[in-house]
Amino acid sequence: MRKIILFALFTLTTLSAKAHSQEEQVNINVAGIDLAISSNGPSSPSVHTFSRHTKYRSHLALFELGFNIPTNVSYGTTEPWFNLINAKSTQYTFNVFSVGTRLSPNGTVGLSAALGITWSNYVFETPTRVQRTDGMLTAEPVDTKGWVKSKINTFALHLPILLEVGQRKGFFAAVGGYGDLVVGSRSKIKYSKHNKEINRGLNLPLLQAGVTARVGYRRVYMFGNYSLTELFRNEGPSTNILTIGLGIGF
């Protein structure tokens, strides 16, 4: 966790330094509230609320909703079990802290980064129990009597970095990458009458990374994330996750 926070602070410091050296502004968004750090020189920084005169504003939205789709699934010698209901396998992302700076004189090209949290759900089509047994990740069917749903949840710190092209208050497109620090994972089986079974600590990869693209208008956009890191370690099925969804900001 320390490494990803330090990296986020390093990114902010780098963008701020660039802005100061060029007598520009770095715009910071904290939970939907905009601030602008400006400087007429290295010794005269100031912080003020966002205004219409601000040179550049990140397009990263405060909230993103996506749907997880497994790709390149391979089970090796094990029985297939990672079959998801894609419409229910959702991902929620809150970009709590974001920063942006322009890279072109007219402000049509910019660099954005954010630090947020991501909650991912992988909902199975059939009743499935996923747990670690003797150091291995195992999956087995469970009784359908009283069964409501079974799923895997992950919780991660999220750091996207994007190169944006477009109008500050209009249409834009962006490409970049992201890194996730997975701080929690669990499987859950829910039964009727409010009964449930939870298995924690699935030992998923701590660090996950991928590529991302966005296209939209102001802070409303469609996005796609593709994980270059497999969801499971060698003990689980081989799969990369594609997430497609919508971002909404202020």
Regions found by a protein language model. Give the residues of each.
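Cleavable N-terminal export/targeting peptides
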Residues: 1-50
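Short loop/turn motifs that connect adjacent beta-strands in outer-membrane beta-barrel proteins
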Residues: 50-58, 101-109, 124, 169-170
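Residues on the lipid-exposed face of transmembrane beta-strands in outer-membrane beta-barrel proteins
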Residues: 52, 63, 92-100, 115-117, ...
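Residues that define the transmembrane beta-barrel architecture of outer-membrane proteins
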Residues: 57-61, 86-94, 153-157, 205-209, ...
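Transmembrane beta-strands of outer-membrane beta-barrel pores
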Residues: 67-71, 98, 115-123, 179-183, ...
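Extracellular/periplasm-exposed beta-strand and loop segments of Gram-negative cell-envelope proteins
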Residues: 70-88, 122-153, 182-212
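Predominantly the C-terminal beta-signal and adjacent terminal strand-loop region
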Residues: 74, 198-250
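Repeated loop/turn-to-beta-strand initiation elements of outer-membrane beta-barrel proteins
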Residues: 104, 170-173, 219-224
